[in-house]
UniProtKB/Swiss-Prot annotation:
Its EC number is 3.4.-.-. Keywords: Cytoplasmic vesicle, Glycoprotein, Hydrolase, Protease, Serine protease, Signal. Protease that may play a role in T-cell development. It comes from Mus musculus (Mouse). One of its GO terms (biological process) is proteolysis. It is found in: Cytoplasmic vesicle. InterPro entries: AB_hydrolase_fold (IPR029058), Peptidase_S28 (IPR008758), Ser_carbopepase_S28_SKS (IPR042269). The lineage of its organism: Eukaryota, Metazoa, Chordata, Craniata, Vertebrata. GO terms for molecular function: serine-type exopeptidase activity. GO terms for cellular component: endosome; lysosome. It comes from the Eukaryota. This is Thymus-specific serine protease. Residues 1-22 form the signal peptide. Belongs to the peptidase S28 family.
């Protein structure tokens, strides 16, 4: 029997010591932005998802650890949140916000687009935290024997079970349509929930959903480079060239020997030694993640930098321009990100990364890192590379270097990772999932949109590509500064849901 976990309140799930590896840096950045938006949304005057005095309810569901084996009686407690302040009856729509690879707080039902849509339909808003993340942790730690119960298929079984259990617990009518919302990996889960359980899930809105698993995600940095040239968000060809120049200088200093490396370490506010090639690759990967993360979350509340600001730094538009260089601009960008996220230094130790990811004890700081690495090794890949000759950044860390983590931490070979990725696409259908009544929403500056659906697959599988929008921006709390294209995109989402809900009312009358 799982032990009920206490609510730990608002935790900024960010390491106090440093950022390490590209993937971990992006996770820290995502968590930082998510927590900022969730905590800000609960203050009066921010967002449009709730009224004064609104209090979300927290609950726990007892779920089977292995839903595919009826003889296994082990269970765990899965956390959910409820916002019923706009609910007008038993047969109203239910908006289910599916959690992804991280913790879910009360803001998951109080802020963002699903919560903002609720008043128009008198909808009930629920969020469901993903197994093995946040406080929805099975007892026993994170060793391999337990991680075998962590997969998208297990998560979907949880969604189906929760949908049925919550209908009874919350007195939801059998005629109420359930609409799944999710962003990024959770957007894929929303799609697949509709695909696998059409009798339980009426429709889905999949935001920035990377439906196609891929081992070598070289297209990520191709989109980053293209987005750095977009004038609408403050980019330019000169900005891209400056970014390339900055990385060339970092690589020159790394090759110049110990003295130059010591200077580089001090100037970047980095912690640790650069003696080992593997640590140099980690540093270059972290710097790429900083640039990529700026593009990925451009313009969002809580993001340390925007593309416009980053390009301004790289091009020396602030301060003494005559003394500025792209490398100096990159240094300033690193300092801004570290300061914004409360970091002591930029970490790049491969040995420390492996040790951290090999720790089987659930951690409050850095929660979810080992779990998400396991899912990339056993289902999705998503290893960002920049190995082509046209890459504007560093060609390190290369794909083999990244795949080594799967072997070092879990004993999984590159061949097994490739096989797992192929099986994922075969099972779900990749970018042609064949699910009806799913709206795919993406932003064209988001590097992940190339793995999603950006053109209509049919009348019941529409796609919406929002100009100049970043990752999951449509799900973020509304702000007065939102662009006209983002506002229009949200209106189109609302209209599509209205059309689908009209159809169900016609069929019931």
């Amino acid at each position: 029997m799982a032990v009920k976990a206490p609510w730990l309140g608002f935790l900024l799930l960010v390491s106090l010591w440093g950022l390490s590896t590209p993937a971990l840096l992006l996770r820290r950045l995502r968590e930082h932005i998510q927590k900022f938006q969730e905590s800000s949304s609960l203050h009066p005057g921010f967002g449009l998802g709730h009224g004064p005095g609104a209090v979300p309810k927290q609950g726990w569901l007892e779920q089977p650890l292995d839903p595919f084996n009826a003889s296994d009686r082990r269970t765990f407690l899965q956390r959910y949140w409820v916002n019923d302040q706009h609910r007008t009856g038993q047969d109203v729509p239910v908006f289910l916000h599916i959690g992804g690879e991280g913790s879910l707080g009360p803001g998951s039902v109080m802020a963002g687009h699903p919560a903002a849509l609720a008043p128009a339909w008198g909808a009930l808003v629920i969020s469901l935290e993903h197994r093995f993340y946040g406080l929805s942790m099975p007892a026993g730690g994170l060793d391999l024997a337990l991680l075998r119960y962590l997969s998208s298929r297990h998560a979907l079984a949880d969604v189906a079970s929760a949908r049925q259990a919550l209908s009874g617990l919350l007195n939801v009518s059998s005629s109420s349509p359930w609409i799944c919302f999710g962003g990024s990996y959770a957007g894929s889960l929303a799609t697949w929930a509709r695909l696998k359980f059409p009798h339980l899930v009426f429709a889905a809105v999949a935001s920035s959903a990377p439906l196609s698993a891929v081992v070598d995600f070289s297209a990520y940095n191709q989109v980053v480079a293209r987005s750095l040239t977009q004038v609408a968000i403050g980019g330019s060809l000169e900005c891209l060239a400056a970014a390339s120049t900055a990385f060339t200088e970092v690589e020159r200093l790394l090759r110049a020997g110990p003295a130059a490396q010591a200077v580089l370490r001090e100037e970047l506010g980095a912690c640790g030694s650069l003696d080992l090639t593997e640590d140099q690759a980690e540093l270059l990967g972290a710097l790429q993640a900083l640039v990529g993360g700026t593009v990925q979350y451009d313009g969002q509340a809580g993001a340390p930098l925007s593309v416009r600001q980053l390009c301004g730094l790289l091009l020396g538009k602030w301060g003494n321009r005559s003394r500025s260089t792209p490398y100096l601009g990159l240094r300033r960008a690193v300092q801004i990100v570290l300061r914004s996220m409360g970091q002591k230094c930029l970490s790049f130790s491969r040995a420390e990364t492996v040790a951290q990811l090999s720790n089987t004890e659930p951690q409050v700081s850095g929660v979810g890192d080992r779990q998400w690495l396991y899912q990339t090794c056993t289902e999705f890949g998503f290893y960002v590379t920049c190995e082509g000759l046209q890459c504007p950044f560093s060609q390190l860390p290369a794909l083999p270097f990244q795949l080594e983590l799967c072997e070092q931490v879990f004993g999984l070979s590159p061949a097994s990772v490739a096989q797992a990725v192929a099986q994922t696409n075969s099972y779900y259908g990749g970018q042609s999932p064949g699910a009806t009544q799913v709206l795919f929403v993406n932003g064209d500056t988001d590097p992940w949109h190339v793995l999603s659906v950006t053109q209509d697959l049919g009348l019941s599988e529409p796609a919406l590509l929002i100009p100049s929008a970043s990752h999951c921006f449509d799900m973020a709390p509304m702000r007065p500064s939102d662009s006209p294209s983002l506002r229009l995109g949200r209106q189109k989402i609302s209209q599509q849901l209205q059309d689908w809900l009209k159809d169900i009312k016609k069929s019931q009358s």
